[in-house]
UniProtKB/Swiss-Prot annotation:
The keyword rRNA-binding applies. Keywords: Ribonucleoprotein, Ribosomal protein, RNA-binding, rRNA-binding. GO terms for molecular function: rRNA binding; structural constituent of ribosome. One of its GO terms (cellular component) is ribosome. The keyword Ribonucleoprotein applies. This is Large ribosomal subunit protein bL9. The gene is rplI. InterPro entries: Ribosomal_bL9, Ribosomal_bL9/RNase_H1_N, Ribosomal_bL9_bac/chp, Ribosomal_bL9_C, Ribosomal_bL9_C_sf, Ribosomal_bL9_N, Ribosomal_bL9_N_sf. Binds to the 23S rRNA.
Length: 150
């Protein structure tokens, strides 16, 4: 299905690009989320009329993400979890746990933004983690996983 992108989407394209995606991806995710519209003549004309408005909105979203990126870059977030004597955790530290720690530090984040390329953290230590606040704004933070004291 051919669609018009209403915002920049990583790995797909920029605002205004006409791209071909699988029908299910367009119908079930992109169109309902307001990230794209079908590439019909009427929608293309409507997009051209609203282009400046959409570009301004995207610039504002990116500027907000850059501000949050500057606050987050280089920060250390501590997460306490029960651990054995050998340093292995009982359970694991997931992206939801890290997002909750970031929010507790006073910076807006959701678990979908936290990138754990090697999966959940399963041992005590310090880990470099990326927080993708926007396609063009990725902050690198240090997550210190410590053994919880009771």
């Amino acid at each position: 299905m051919q669609i018009i992108l209403l915002e920049k989407i990583g790995g797909l394209g920029n605002l205004g690009d006409i791209v071909t995606v699988k029908n299910g991806y367009a119908r079930n995710f992109l169109i309902p989320a307001g990230k794209a519209k079908r590439a019909t003549e009427a929608n293309m004309k409507e997009f051209e009329v609203r282009r400046a408005e959409l570009e301004a909105k995207q610039a504002e979203i990116l500027a907000d993400a850059r501000v949050r990126q500057e606050k987050l870059d280089g920060q250390t977030v501590t997460v306490a979890q029960k651990a054995g004597v050998d340093g292995r955790l009982f359970g694991s530290v997931t992206n939801a746990d890290i997002a909750a720690a970031i929010v507790a530090a006073g910076i807006e984040a959701v678990k979908a933004n936290v990138r754990l390329p090697n999966g959940p953290l399963k041992a005590v230590g310090e880990y470099e983690v990326e927080v993708a606040l926007h396609t063009d704004a990725v902050a690198k933070i240090t997550v210190a996983v410590v053994a919880a004291t009771e």
